[in-house]
Each structure stands twice: as C-alpha cells, then as structure tokens.
C-alpha cells in the first residue's frame, strides 16, 4: 500500500508545532475573504461580503444589531478587507539539491525542502490562505495554481512527494517564467540552495517584487557546504553534470572554497536587502519547526 503523502513529509509532530504559528502578509493583499491579512481596500470603498458568528474579542462596532434583533444572535459583518493571501511555493528539484552530508540526519537538501514546503503549505491552508506549487530545475516542471481547500493540500503534498532531483538549474529563468503565473498580489516562497548566477536570480526577484509579490527566500544548504570539513583525498562528483568529477586534496582547496562561498552568501544577503526580500538561510541539520518558529517570531518584530 502506498504511504499516505500527508504523513510522509508532514508528520503529526510537525503539525502540532506548526499549528500554533501564524504567518501574516507584510504587504496589503487583495483576494477572497475569510483570511487574516490586511487588505489594500479600506474605508468607503470596502464592500460587505457576509456574516459570521461573533466571538469573544471581536469589535463591538462590527456587530450587525439589526440581524441581532431578528435572530437574537450576535453576528459580525465581514467585508472585503478581511482577505486571504495567495502563496506560491517554488521548490528546486535540480541535481544539486540531492546532496546529503554527514550531519544532515540522512536528509538531502531536497528532502528538507519538501518537508519545509509541506509545513508551509499546511500552515497556509490552516489559515484559510491559498497555496500553490511550482517545482523546477532548468524550467518549471509542475505547476499547481493556489487554492485553499483541504483536498487541495493533499494535491500539493502528493506532488511534492513525487518530485525527483535531476539535472541542472536555472533559478533566474524559472522565476522570470513565474511572473506570468503570479498576476495577483501575493507571497512567493522560494526553497532552493541558490547555487547559480546571483545577478540573474535577483534580476528576476526584483521583477517579482515590482509585480506586487512579497518574496521569501529559504536558502537550504548542507553543513558541509558551509564549512567544507573534508580532510582526506576526495573524489568530488557534480550532481548536476554527471560526467564532471575531480579527485583532489580538499585541504588545499578549503581556504579558496570558503572565501568564494562567503562572497556568494554576501551577494545573496545584499540582493535580498536591496530588494526587500526576506532571506532565510537554513541548514539541513536544523529542525523544520524550529526554523519556521524562529523566522515567524523575527518577522513579527520587523
């Protein structure tokens, strides 16, 4: 029997920890009612949408007293300014994401991205937000438009569970293609190791920002890529170009590698700051729920 995808990457312990979190859109959104985010439409231009039962903590002025007189029950008038956000998860499935180091609990970067994306999808749907999915390598491989229904969550999780790493990546090109899929204001959440052309990456990310998209960049990396711990003569194989391999003394390369890696990270951090993008560097040795809890707490203080 095929394992339930809901619990392959989204475990009950993750659900328990994620359920207490709340991801609020920073930018005003526009869309269907019923969510928790601030709308772009305010004041007299706001249209009445529907009633919902009054709960403790609601503003008294929002109570529909005429309806109370007819039903003897308290109801709140909901307007178009109580909106849900459209979020798009963009998950890298290129060959480099298939790396797993000695400290990653046997998880590849792709495994980690799938589980983190699953947690994000569950969190968004539980907030009555709409979540969509794009998986990619050199091009978009799967595209699921944003929806908020519980059965839609299953489709997203099944697609994530079926994704396989392969080949090279063109993150900048893929994000440029994404522009045509994100016509309405929302949040784009990118999960990738971001190994590639940084200038092309931010050229596309800046266009997404100009297209009214809030962008979250989860850069998923392995501890080995951060500190290059290799000591003995090692055969390094490319995970994207399978014919490329190199037998070297890693100690002689370590200083040069760490310098170039630091420059790469500084470029990503600087590009995110310049474009007002949330950069969340994540190591595969970190717990998923802790990563989300820490980020959301920091986001709430910004």
Segments predicted by a language model, with ranges:
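Conserved phosphate-coordination/catalytic loops
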Residues: 111, 165-172, 195, 259-262
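Von Willebrand factor type A / integrin I
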Residues: 1-40, 50, 180-186, 198-302
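Von Willebrand factor
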Residues: 152-189, 198-200, 221-222, 226
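Short amphipathic alpha-helical interaction patches enriched in hydrophobic/aromatic residues
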Residues: 97, 101, 160-164, 276-279
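An amphipathic, basic-hydrophobic helix/alpha-beta surface used to engage anionic
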Residues: 1-148, 187-191, 197, 203, ...
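Helical mechanochemical/support elements of P-loop NTPase systems and associated helical scaffolds
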Residues: 61, 83, 152, 167, ...
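Short, electropositive alpha-helical surface patch
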Residues: 142-158, 297-298
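Short, well-ordered alpha-helical scaffold segments within catalytic/effector domains
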Residues: 114, 118, 171-175, 202, ...
